[in-house]
């Protein structure tokens, strides 16, 4: 069987490209690495890169958009979870989210894995978690 070496990137459809790119860039300390558009498909897109984790996140804004909003109950994406090292890292992230004014859950130690949940500007469910060992 051919080998998969990892997830190359995660791409989200967003209502406002500039708003989402600014929000995720500030949240993750990432940098904008690519922008482009394709008139044939009616899209504008951007990719950001977070060097510590080597994570690439991409965003697409469609000229024609569905406006019903995100729901984890609709088949498709449930949430995106960012991995952190340990409980102390979750506490640091809670402080970072607070400093950015991003509403979030308390640390949920009763979950497996322990986590903090919040949403992006489009209501996409996000999580910070670490595996209990």
Predicted regions and their residues:
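Core segments of cupin and vicinal oxygen chelate
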Residues: 2, 11-56, 61
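Vicinal oxygen chelate
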Residues: 2-3, 7-15, 46, 51, 68-133, ...
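A short, local hydrophobic-aromatic micro-motif
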Residues: 5-8, 33, 78, 105
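Alpha-helical elements of the RecA-like P-loop NTPase motor core of helicases
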Residues: 21-22, 91, 126
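A short, acidic/glycine-rich surface segment
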Residues: 34, 43, 64-69, 104
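Short Gly/Pro-enriched turn/cap motifs at secondary-structure boundaries
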Residues: 37-38, 71-72, 106-107
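Acetyl-CoA-dependent GNAT
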Residues: 60-66, 130-132
């Amino acid at each position: 069987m051919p080998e998969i070496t990892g997830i190359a990137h995660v791409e989200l459809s967003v209502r406002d490209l500039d708003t989402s790119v600014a929000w995720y860039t500030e949240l993750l300390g990432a940098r904008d690495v690519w922008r482009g558009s394709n008139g044939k498909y009616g899209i504008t897109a951007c990719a950001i890169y977070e060097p510590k984790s080597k994570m690439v996140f991409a965003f697409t804004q469609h000229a024609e958009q569905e406006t019903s909003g995100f729901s984890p109950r609709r088949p498709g994406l449930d949430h995106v979870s960012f991995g952190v090292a340990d409980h102390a890292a979750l506490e640091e992230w809670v402080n970072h989210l607070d400093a950015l004014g991003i509403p979030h859950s308390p640390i949920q130690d009763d979950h497996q894995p322990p986590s903090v949940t919040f949403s992006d500007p489009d209501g996409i469910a996000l999580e910070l978690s670490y595996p209990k060992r």
